[in-house]
Amino acid sequence: MENITKTFQYGGVDWLCEPWVGAGSLGIGRGENPLKFALPLLLLQISVFSIFSVSFQFLLRPFGKFAFLTQMLAGICLGPSVIGRNKQYMATFFYARSVYIIESFEAICFLFICYITTCQVDTRMIKRVGKLAFINGILLFLIPFVWGQFAAILISKRLKSGPAGIPPVEFHHVAIVQSTMFFQVVYGVLSSLKMLNTEPGRLALASMMVHDCLSWCFFMLNIAIKLNVDLPNKNRAAFLSVLQMIMILVIAYVFRPLMLWMKNRTPEGHSLKASYLSVICVLLFISCLWAEFVGLPYFFGAVVLGLATPKRPPLGTGLSDKIGCFVWSVLMPCYVIGIGLNIDLSLFSWRDVIRFELLFGVVRFAKMIAIALPSLYYKVPLWHAILVGFIVNIQGLYDVQIYKQNFNYTKISSKSFGAMVMSATVNSTIFIVIVKKLYQTMSKRNPYKRRTVQHCRVEAPLRILTCFRNREAVRPVLDLVELSRPAIGSPLSVFAVNLEELNNHSLPLLIHHTQEISPFLVPSRRDQIVKAFHNFEKTNQETVLIECFTAVAPRKTMHEDVCAIAFDQETDIVILTLDAGIELWERLLCRNLLHNCPCSVALFIDRGRLPDFRFVPLKKLTINIGAIFLGGPDDREMLAYATRLASHPSVELQVFRLVDQNGVSPLRDMVERNHDMRVINVFRKENSEKNIIFREVRIEEAVNLLDLLRKEGDDFDLMMVGIRHEENLLMLEGLSEWSDMKELGEVGDVLISKDLELSVSVLAVQQ
């Protein structure tokens, strides 16, 4: 090699000496080859990797997003399996010094990955896992390990030998390593598939958390035993064990309080100072260096520090946002290049592939069995158990790094390492596709009957699911429940769902609050919400039944919990309560509910017009409700719910039926017009009470409708509208062009617009 000046052996190790020429090059113009300098070569390697990775992403885009697959393929292409067959290329791009630099960046990348993923894991969640997840975790730890060892013995004996050049001891070690799993990998995959707050996702995460706890305990025990066996000086072994315990204690009782101090010094809503971030990086490097000094893998220090990091922002997820971009964009290419350099596919024959895959297949099947048996015993649906089995079989960067650690310590050969990485890459991609398709099939919720207010019999109990995202929304929700409460007859069933964003938790949660709140404890925010609903239920025991839930989920999939509860509880209508300041992600939540709910959906925009029923006697209250009826299924559903509200003694209902200049329905669809006419006739016949007024208003164009709303709108406390209407209605023409929130429909959107300057609360309904 051109840069080598001396090669010699010392202590049985080959030493390679090169002259130090600096990190940066003066450039081609001054007669220097930039590829002989560390920095230009590193930048070129990262650039080439990025080109390959983006190219694979583009080619695979029609089939979905496969980040792990595209990264591994790019790394393998840069290694000896593809381009690396050219010796000149390897000598230019990956000579000895550049490989050392790549491997150094690879280690730094993985310790950062360990930290930013582990610092989002809330260890308190282990207390909340159920009995099934606990059993799953134990069996996931035991069964793949045992079955893997038996499979290694049988393959070696029945097939007369394992893969060529792989001794039996190494083959057994491959089986042990293959049985490992990582919570962080499953968390990342479920997050990308938007399955974190699904039932299979929760079970998989909880089971993996138990498995990881057992694995780390076993890992520490194995390290302690290895130190005692390998070190002839028992006092030195004991001393190293003590230093390991001291490291954990220092991280827990020195580093953690320091990070808590940084958190408390950071104003709420602000990100960490750059100086604080630098201190945390120093703590990370100290932890990893200490782990290396006391005989532990360097990433163990990163994992322990991540677990000790406070989970509340600006730490936890805040750190991930701060460091993540640099890690995934700059360090990750170095990591994958280092992996690809050690994979040479030309070493494999079909005989080797079959033997390796037989072993890996047995271990994967063992993981499926470990999930399926207890799940079926606890009456989990078969397809849910199969789905969880596929999820826990997905592998990722953590698994690859464990393979690399074993390769570095010469416990497995280059052939075994390549087989494990390729198998993890290919099979995990297949499993991700299977999980995605299976879940899409399972998540289609088709109710066996029409679940709407219109089709709910008058004598049957109305079942309402009301969801909200903050404590301030509890009062308007209870106001709406009070208005929906029947004076006599079957009780109203209410399912109250408190929606919390998944930003301070490691696991999505769906909590069913069934126990009374202890009066001797300081109530949390959740407890205060639950207590408010329970107090309302006690006050109206004969007419209202309330169940409370808390759903902690990512914003993008928050609707999944609402839809699941609505389906399981067979609700007739879901009501989402929002205040006037609607955020962009809340509009996404509205759209998801409107598209996916198995029953009717209502969007309630509270503007403070409804009174607080807790402090004013019902006899002294008058609630004025207006209903705008154009026609169509949504308007019929709205009218059915308005009729229910009108049965409340404090409600005065006024229905505006909008007709054209000829006094007939503006709809062109004759079937819908006939349905509307039948509903209107029944409504007028059965609701001739003094508290209900029915008016027909002739509207020629949108300007007349705006004049009506501007004139009458503020006379009401609540205005009810349908969301969807027939397209190209003359009286709605042009209203959608200045839309503020099209999820409410044209009329609902106009009611909350700033142009009309109305203060009425709005309830928009979709059947």
From Swiss-Prot:
Name of the protein: Cation/H(+) antiporter 27
Lineage: Eukaryota, Viridiplantae, Streptophyta, Embryophyta, Tracheophyta
Keyword Ion transport: yes
Record GO terms (molecular function): antiporter activity
Origin superkingdom: Eukaryota
Membrane topology of this protein: Multi-pass membrane protein
Chief location: membrane
Chain ranges passing through the membrane: 39-59, 63-83, 99-119, 135-155, 173-193, 205-225, 242-262, 280-300, 323-343, 371-391, 415-435
Gene: CHX27
Its job: May operate as a cation/H(+) antiporter.
One GO location term (cellular component): membrane
Entry's family note: Belongs to the monovalent cation:proton antiporter 2 (CPA2) transporter (TC 2.A.37) family. CHX (TC 2.A.37.4) subfamily.
